[in-house]
UniProtKB/Swiss-Prot annotation:
This is Large ribosomal subunit protein uL11. GO terms for biological process: translation. It comes from Lactobacillus acidophilus (strain ATCC 700396 / NCK56 / N2 / NCFM). Pfam families: Ribosomal_L11, Ribosomal_L11_N. Belongs to the universal ribosomal protein uL11 family. One or more lysine residues are methylated.
Length: 141
C-alpha cells in the first residue's frame, strides 16, 4: 500500500547552501520534516549547481518520512546570469538592462524544457524570450 501524503512543501533554496535557519527551517519544521536530514540530502544533491537558486518540491508522508524533487533554476535567474546583470529592469518597456543572444535563449530553453509545459524547443524558446522581455532584456539574433 502506498504511503499517505499529508503535506507538500515548495521552496526555492540556493544550491548546496540549505541550512536549518529561516526560511528553510521554519517551513520544514511546520511540516514535521527532519530538517537536518533534508538539508544534508539537498546540499549533497545540488553541490554541483552552487550559486543557483533551485526550486524543490518536498512531499511529506504520514509517517513523517519525505522525498523531494529538485527542479531546474527559474528562467529569470538563468537569464540574469546569461546577460551578466544583477537585477532586472523596473521599467522593462522603456529601460533595457541587458542583451542575450538567440543561442543563449535556446540553451536556457533546453535546460528548462523538462519543467516547462512546452511541446517543442521553439515553444520553450518563446516562453524564455517572453520572460526576458518582461525583465527588460533584449533578445538579439
Amino acid at each position: 500500500m502506498a504511503k499517505k501524503v499529508i503535506n507538500v512543501v515548495k521552496l526555492q533554496i540556493p544550491a548546496g547552501a540549505a541550512t536549518p535557519a529561516p526560511p528553510v527551517g521554519p517551513a520544514l519544521g511546520q511540516a514535521g520534516i527532519n530538517i537536518v536530514g533534508f538539508t544534508k540530502d539537498f546540499n549533497a544533491r545540488t553541490a554541483d549547481q552552487k550559486g543557483m537558486i533551485i526550486p524543490v518540491v518536498i512531499t511529506v508522508y504520514e509517517d513523517r518520512s519525505f522525498e523531494f524533487i529538485t527542479k531546474t533554476p527559474p528562467a529569470p535567474v538563468l537569464l540574469k546570469q546569461a546577460a551578466k546583470i544583477d537585477k532586472a529592469s523596473g521599467e522593462p518597456n522603456t529601460k533595457k538592462v541587458g542583451k542575450v543572444t538567440k543561442d543563449q535563449v535556446k540553451e536556457i530553453a533546453e535546460t528548462k524544457m523538462k519543467d516547462l509545459n512546452a511541446a517543442d524547443i521553439e515553444a520553450a524558446m518563446r516562453m524564455v524570450e517572453g520572460t526576458a522581455r518582461s525583465m527588460g532584456i533584449e533578445v538579439e539574433d
